[in-house]
C-alpha cells in the first residue's frame, strides 16, 4: 500500500470519524503529510474491528489467483456483486496484508506459508487464503494500528468524542456548491459540542447493525456516518445489504456474542 497521498487539500488537519481498521489506516496514511484528528465515539475497545475474529483475506498462496478470489466472491454474493469492486479488492489484497505485517500485526505464523503466515480456509473460499491471529484477528490488527497511531506525532486520538454532524455550506448558509468544512463533535466526558474545522473529513464509522434488535455488532454500530453523509447531500446506496453473522450465542438479558466460524 502506498504511504503517500496527493489530495490537493487546503492547509489544516484532516478529521477522521471512526477509530477502527478503516479510520486508523487512513490516519496513518495521511499523517505523513498533515495533522490528523481521529474521533472515537466510545472507548477504543468498542470498535467493531476489535470484535472481529476469523481473519482477513489475501490472494497469497501459489495455489490461489485473482480470478479464483473474484469468482468465489461473486458466487458467495449470489451474482449481485459489483465485479469491479471485487476485482479491485482481490488485486490489492496481498499488498494490504503485507502492509499490516509491516505495521506490526502479529498474525499466526507458518514458516512454510506465504509471507511466513498460516492461512486457513473459511466458507465460500476455494483455497486457504485467510491470514489470522489465532481466533482474535480483529483485536490483533486494532492493537497494532492503534499503537502506531498513538506514537505518531501527527495523529491526535480523541476518545469518547461523538461526531454529531458535518459542518457544510448548507449549515453556514453559503450559496456555493456543497462543501464540508469540518465536524460538530460532542465531547462526551465534558458534555460540550465542539466545532472542529478541517481540510477534509473522512467518514469511517462502520455499519448499522445495532439498529436491529439482534446483532453481533457492538453498540457503536448505529450508522452515524451514513446519516451524516445523507444529511450533507451525499448519495446513499445499497442500504438493503446488512451483514448479519449467522452464528451467535443468544442470552435474553445480555448482548449477543459472536461465535466465529473459524
Where are these regions (language model features)?
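Residues forming the flavin
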Residues: 1-71, 134-262
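N-terminal flexible segment immediately upstream of the FAD-binding catalytic core
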Residues: 2-4, 12, 69, 73, ...
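Beta1-alpha1 glycine-rich phosphate/pyrophosphate-binding loop at the start
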Residues: 30, 54, 103-129, 133
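Rossmann-like flavin
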Residues: 76-118
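Short, charged low-complexity intrinsically disordered segments located at boundaries
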Residues: 86-88, 98-105, 127-132, 172-177, ...
Amino acid at each position: 500500500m502506498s504511504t503517500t497521498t496527493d489530495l490537493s487539500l487546503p492547509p489544516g488537519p484532516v478529521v477522521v470519524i471512526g477509530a477502527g481498521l478503516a479510520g486508523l489506516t487512513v490516519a496513518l496514511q495521511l499523517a505523513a503529510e498533515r495533522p490528523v484528528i481521529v474521533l472515537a465515539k466510545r472507548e477504543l475497545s468498542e470498535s467493531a474491528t476489535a470484535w472481529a475474529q476469523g481473519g482477513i483475506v489475501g490472494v497469497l498462496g501459489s495455489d490461489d489467483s485473482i480470478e479464483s478470489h473474484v469468482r468465489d466472491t461473486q458466487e458467495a454474493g449470489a451474482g449481485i456483486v459489483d465485479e469491479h469492486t471485487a476485482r479491485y479488492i482481490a488485486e490489492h489484497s496481498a499488498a494490504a496484508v503485507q502492509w499490516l505485517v509491516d505495521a506490526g500485526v502479529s498474525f499466526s505464523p507458518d514458516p512454510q506459508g506465504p509471507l511466513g503466515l498460516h492461512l486457513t480456509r473459511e466458507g465460500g473460499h476455494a483455497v486457504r487464503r485467510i491470514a489470522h491471529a489465532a481466533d482474535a484477528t480483529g483485536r490483533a490488527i486494532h492493537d497494532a494500528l492503534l499503537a502506531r497511531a498513538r506514537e505518531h506525532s501527527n495523529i491526535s486520538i480523541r476518545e469518547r468524542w461523538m461526531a454529531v454532524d458535518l459542518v457544510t455550506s448548507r449549515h453556514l448558509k453559503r450559496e456555493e456548491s456543497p462543501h464540508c468544512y469540518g465536524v460538530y463533535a460532542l465531547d462526551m466526558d465534558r458534555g460540550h459540542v465542539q466545532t472542529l474545522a478541517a481540510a477534509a473529513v473522512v467518514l469511517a464509522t462502520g455499519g448499522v447493525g445495532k439498529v436491529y434488535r439482534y446483532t453481533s455488532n457492538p453498540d457503536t454500530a448505529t450508522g452515524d456516518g451514513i446519516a451524516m453523509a445523507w444529511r450533507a447531500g451525499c448519495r446513499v446506496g445499497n442500504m438493503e445489504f446488512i451483514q448479519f453473522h449467522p452464528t451467535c450465542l443468544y442470552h435474553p438479558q445480555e448482548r449477543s456474542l459472536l461465535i466465529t466460524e473459524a
